[in-house]
């Protein structure tokens, strides 16, 4: 984890902009709507707290797939003079017997405690201190460490020169296609970070005769990656077609292409031109799906829009799905 002051990238944390060019695309509409999860909690005598905290540190905190670092683990019950402690998420352990076995392992003899799995807590911290205080009262006491998105921005690893090179590649081809009179000057560049020289550059297939309406540049690119796998070009094949790929687009993708990128498990998408009527990444585009960061889906990917004017693209009708 790099400290903000040591980050080589210039980041505007308030507006989510990196190096004055990459605008972070996230579903900020839902970020302050708590996604509640069930956790295991235990009510104990304060004298037993040391052993329980040791169990949390040595087991639950290390192995729980859900980070609960934004929670205060302990809250006091003044009326009963007991402590209520959050142990772990039910995603980590769903069986009550397993929890009891772990608790029994830290005590000699029989101990009385109340175990519960009906406590609901926010899975993620809110973006403001005011909401943090409100959720602490309504759900469970939280720790305020600042806006969580600041850390997300700070953790991005981005080679700006590589981004420029690939966007320039896509832009040049798109302009060339438009100059040649092609109706769909959309371009996608698929880059496997582990094989950067062996990239896939895909033009929109709808410019060709006998094409299908779904032959968008993204779909053509994914298909090309699949063909390489089938032909044995990529020997280290994964179960997902484009696992951890970086994808560079001339135009904001439509819902079909955005979902195809979800299914392909790409890592990052960078696009040049937003499509206000048909796009599916920005909250202000299309129906506001924000497909890359939608809580209803089981996967996400990073998304950015290049907000500089260095890389022109071929223009398309605003109702065209890209």
UniProtKB/Swiss-Prot annotation:
InterPro entries: CMP_dCMP_dom, Cytidine_deaminase-like. It holds the Pfam family dCMP_cyt_deam_1. CDD domains: nucleoside_deaminase. Residues 162-283 form the CMP/dCMP-type deaminase domain. The keyword Cytoplasm applies. GO terms for molecular function: tRNA-specific adenosine deaminase activity. Keywords: Cytoplasm, Nucleus, Peroxisome, tRNA processing. GO terms for cellular component: cytoplasm; nucleus; peroxisome; tRNA-specific adenosine-34 deaminase complex. Zn(2+) binds at residues 216, 254, 257, 322. It is found in: Cytoplasm; Nucleus; Peroxisome. One of its GO terms (biological process) is tRNA modification. SUPFAM superfamilies: Cytidine deaminase-like (SSF53927). Present with 892 molecules/cell in log phase SD medium. Belongs to the cytidine and deoxycytidylate deaminase family. ADAT3 subfamily. Heterodimer with TAD2. Structural subunit of tRNA-specific adenosine deaminase, which deaminates adenosine-34 (the first, also called wobble position of the anticodon) to inosine in many tRNAs. Inosine-34 allows the decoding of 3 different nucleotides at the third position of mRNA codons, as inosine is able to pair with U, C, and A. This is tRNA-specific adenosine deaminase subunit TAD3. The lineage of its organism: Eukaryota, Fungi, Dikarya, Ascomycota, Saccharomycotina.
